[in-house]
Swiss-Prot record:
May bind 1 zinc ion per subunit. Zn(2+) binds at residues 899, 901, 910-911. This is Protein translocase subunit SecA. CDD domains: DEXDc_SecA (cd17928), SF2_C_secA (cd18803). Keywords: ATP-binding, Cell inner membrane, Cell membrane, Cytoplasm, Membrane, Metal-binding, Nucleotide-binding, Protein transport, Translocase, Translocation, Transport, Zinc. SMART domains: SecA_DEAD, SecA_PP_bind. It comes from Cellvibrio japonicus (strain Ueda107) (Pseudomonas fluorescens subsp. cellulosa). Its cofactor is Zn(2+).
Length: 915
């Protein structure tokens, strides 16, 4: 009550922000008459003037009114588009490092020019981030005349672009590109062999278009640069054949504490958490099948440590069959399994599921199984974009995720008012008992809307549903066009004509996002089809478009038909936002049934029972605000669960991210340094001290010393034969500290002599050796971290907190990494022999060829929230113990040794195939 009263007196936070920025808009408007008097050249010179003022100490905040006024005037002259006052407010929101929620058709692309120009004055570069190459190129070329009229350079980065062109694009004042390409370039730069190989400048300011898509929908998608690993294609095929013989257990829910099973089976499926688990009987059945197929020894257990790889194959195959369905989560295209983005309905070529799941689906679909890969470098969008000192974003739907933006990224959301009042009508949902009734109602309503000359957009959540709707509309004789992942190439043309009178378009989720549906269709598309169109032809096309536009307005504008609710309210709002652009009329409605996934899995039993108790006749629908509220509550549950998963993934990746930043910082220092001799000297002293301490414990008596062992170790590590025992016999005053110093002096003198013999090239060798050791060790460390994270869930069963265990053990692994880099570097430098400049260059070429063979991948993490028992929180921490990822138990078996399973075969031809 008090909160409402305060809000009424002082206004909401959003209203107060808009009021504050409105005062600055008044200042910008006051500058407009003076700027209109300037010539084009004088307007261009304003950029130099503003840059000089920034260099002299003025802040970007102080320059903002004049800079925005300059951009507005350039837009009016060059593009014929003058920024509205609300667009200026959007620009200020972006400048301040926040998210501007702007409705569809409110000109987000034009808004971005304001803060992009302002921040480019600082000379540190501005990155404008889009979701695909087409939008990056389109927006850059569309806004290029405006920027160039003000003396600003514009660059575009695209996938597969040569490094020299990328370097030029990044050197521009304003750079357009995709989130994927920015992230991959960051990773590649941190694998570069020299400073000259890098393409990016230090990160400064980024504006993310469709920020919700990139920072929330893509948050669970790590960017990974990988190299080829061992091929296990045959194992995937064999396990896939076995899994098809397993049956699913059907549960009828719970009766008190007892689970009621209607059909016993080998595995259970939890659709909410997307998990598959073997039942007790299923575990026995799988072991029997594996033994029969000679994949498991008769006396072996599937859960033994040396069979973890086999268990991993079984679990992956189970998930591929039970959780992933063709034409819903993926399609098979040209002999490849291509994933479908659940949020947009677009295909994602080149993107693969991690942890062997993609290979399991390939085996299921009987297509070529691509080899698994080894991670060489990785990051997440969450951690990459948090590297920018200032980050901003634009989208039509951010307010429902405002808490997550603030919690994860520290970004506040400001809802920007529309330039014209919204005329769209959002109708209550219609809820039917069955899918069949729902589809029949949709067909009837679409037929009526289309007959009334209203354009109709039918939004679906999957390719399967879009094709089902297409079949039903065809049967009803309704002409329509389909826009889904299978028809990606025709997307622009379909969207361009989707606003014509009576046109019916079926689209998966938000396919076509980023392009407005214009009422009456886009007349520009018709002009583009004509070669050398005359003014008369253009006028005729415009006149025809005016007629169509008026017909559509009279029919109530674009009609949106949602065939089901998405898990996220934000995706539903995006679909609704396709109608009612720039004050146009429009109507939206969602059609649901109790058999829809969201209703079946997440809606409460109470609502289901309530609807059935009403005794609804076949074909009847419930249309009430109470039903809408119940559905929104179900969506909030799912959103909360997904947020917890994303937050938890971030907490795990934050551990790796801290380590990544340390390694990349050290690597950059190595690249920048001309001479690392002093660093090598310090590292050598540390390594030598560690080696000596193993055989001469600090502050120990001489009887505890292992001099013979020390002499042998020094020969192994440093290639030196030192007669330490003889030194001690000859000099009784040679105690621990003097002895350490003498050993170090001998090692240093030997190394100095080698450097003298090899010459100046030794400086380059030192640098390259340390870089190579760091890269190889980091690669091994990433693999160890992957193994650690995959098994860390199980710690909760031992009453331990998985997060705390992960942090502790990853820290130990990182300490080992740093020690390994030091020891390996000194060991290699001690063994290095003189080489020529030509040999050095040949080694460099070989490393570059290896880099060129690496693949850029985006993997979907299929991780659910990790279990954390309350007991784990309160239990005292266990004594620290060094723990490496479990790979095998017992003695390591040679590849040509007899297999321990007793089959009589060589290990490499039997169970060694699993490694």
């Amino acid at each position: 009550m008090i909160g409402k009263l305060i809000k009424k007196i002082f206004g909401s936070k959003n209203e107060r922000e808009l009021k504050r920025m409105g005062k600055v808009v008044t200042l910008i408007n006051a500058l407009e008459p003076e700027l209109q008097k300037l010539s084009d050249e004088q307007l261009k010179e304003k950029t130099t003037e503003l840059r000089n003022r920034y260099s002299a100490g003025e802040t970007l905040d102080q320059l903002l009114p004049e800079a925005f006024a300059v951009v507005r005037e350039a837009g009016r002259r060059v593009l014929g588009m003058r920024h509205f006052d609300v667009q200026l407010i959007g620009g200020m929101t972006l400048h301040e490092g926040r998210i501007a929620e702007m409705r569809t058709g409110e000109g987000k692309t034009l808004v971005s020019t304001l803060p992009a120009y302002l921040h480019a004055l600082a000379g540190k570069g501005v990155h404008v981030v889009t979701v695909n190459d087409y939008l990056a190129s389109r927006d850059a070329n569309w806004m290029r005349p405006l920027y160039e009229a003000l003396g600003m350079s514009v660059g575009v980065i695209q996938s597969m672009q040569p490094a020299v062109l990328k370097r030029q694009a990044y050197a521009s004042d304003i750079t357009y590109g995709t989130n994927n390409e920015y992230g991959f370039d960051y990773l590649r730069d941190n694998m570069a062999l020299s400073k000259q190989d890098k393409v990016q400048r230090p990160l400064n300011y980024a504006i993310i278009d469709e920020v919700d898509s990139i920072l929330i929908d893509e948050a669970r998608t790590p960017l990974i640069i990988s190299g080829a690993a061992e091929n296990s294609a045959e194992m995937y095929k064999r396990v896939n054949q076995l899994v098809t013989k397993l049956t699913r257990q059907i549960d009828n829910g719970e009766d008190g504490d007892r689970r009621v099973i209607s059909v016993a089976g080998d595995f259970t499926v939890d659709e909410k958490s997307r998990q598959v688990e073997l039942t007790e009987g299923g575990h026995q059945h799988v072991e029997e099948l594996l033994i029969k197929a000679n994949l498991l020894a008769p006396d072996q257990n599937l859960y033994a440590a040396n069979n973890l790889t086999l268990l991993h194959h079984v679990n992956s195959a189970l998930r591929a069959h039970a959780l992933f369905h063709r034409d819903i989560e993926y399609i098979v295209q040209e002999g490849q399994v291509v994933l479908i983005d659940e949020h947009t309905g677009r295909t994602m070529p080149g993107r693969r599921l991690s942890e062997g799941l993609h290979q399991a689906i390939e085996a299921k679909e009987s297509v070529e199984i691509q080899s698994e890969s080894q991670t060489l470098a990785s990051t997440t969008f969450q951690n990459y974009f948090r590297l920018y000192p200032t980050l901003a974003g634009m989208t039509g739907t951010a307010d429902t995720e405002a808490y997550e933006f603030r919690e994860i990224y520290g970004l506040d959301v400001v809802v920007i008012p529309t330039n014209r009042p919204i005329q769209r009508i959002d109708m209550n949902d219609k809820v039917y008992l069955s899918l069949e009734e729902k589809y029949a109602a949709i067909v009837e309503d679409v037929k009526a809307f289309s007959a009334n000359n209203a354009p109709v957009l039918v939004g679906t959540a999957s390719i399967e549903t879009s094709e089902e709707m297409s079949r039903r509309l065809t049967s009803a004789g309704i002409k329509h066009q389909v826009l889904n992942a299978k028809f990606h190439a025709q997307e622009a043309e379909i969207i361009a004509q989707a606003g014509r009178p009576g046109t019916v378009t079926i689209a998966t989720n938000m396919a076509g996002r980023g392009t407005d549906i214009v009422l009456g269709g886009r007349w520009e598309s018709e002009v583009e089809k004509l070669e050398n169109a005359t003014p008369e032809q253009i006028d005729a096309i415009k006149a025809e478009w005016e007629k169509r536009h008026d017909i559509v307005l009279a029919a109530g504008g674009l009609h949106i038909v949602g065939t089901e609710r998405h898990e996220s309210r934000r995706i539903d709002n995006q679909l609704r936002g396709r109608a009612g652009r720039q004050g146009d009329p429009g109507v939206t409605r969602f059609y649901l049934s109790l058999e829809d996934n969201l209703m079946r899995i997440f809606a409460s039993d109470r609502m289901r029972n309530f609807m059935q108790a009403l005794g609804m006749e076949k074909g009847e629908a419930i249309e009430h605000r109470m039903v809408n509220n119940a559905i929104e509550n179900a969506q909030r549950k799912v959103e909360g669960r997904n947020f917890d998963i994303r937050k938890q993934l971030l907490e795990f990746d934050d551990v790796a991210n801290d380590q990544r930043q340390i390694v990349y910082h050290q690597r950059n220092e190595l690249l920048d340094a001309e001479n690392i001799r002093d660093t090598i000297t310090v590292v050598r002293a540390d390594v030598l001290n560690d080696v000596v301490s193993q055989y001469i414990p600090p502050q120990s008596i001489e009887d505890m010393w292992d001099i013979a062992g020390l002499e042998k170790q020094l020969e192994v590590d440093f290639g030196l034969r030192l007669s330490i025992a003889k030194w001690l016999e000859e000099d009784t005053r040679l105690h621990e500290e003097p002895l350490r110093k003498r050993i170090l002096d001998e090692v240093q003198a030997t190394y100095d002599a080698k450097c003298e013999r090899i010459g100046e090239i030794m400086l380059e060798i030192e640098k390259q050796v340390m870089l190579q050791v760091l890269d190889n060790s980091w690669k091994e460390h990433l693999a160890a971290m992957d193994h650690l994270r995959q098994g860390i869930n199980l710690r909760s069963y031992a009453q331990r907190n998985p997060k705390q265990e992960y942090k502790r053990e990853s820290f130990e692994l990182f300490q080992q990494l740093l020690q390994r880099v030091k020891h390996e570097t000194i060991h290699l430098l001690a063994r290095v022999e003189p080489i020529t400049r030509e040999q050095m260059e040949a080694m460099e070429i070989q490393r570059r060829e290896e880099l060129a063979r690496q693949k850029m991948q985006m993997r979907h993490e299929q991780l659910s929230a990790m279990p954390e028992s309350p007991e784990a929180e309160s239990e005292p921490a266990a004594a620290p113990q060094r723990q490496a990822p479990v790979v095998r138990e017992g003695r390591k078996v040679g590849r040509n040794d007899p297999c321990p399973c007793g089959s009589g075969k060589k290990y490499k031809n039997c169970h060694g195939q699993l490694e």
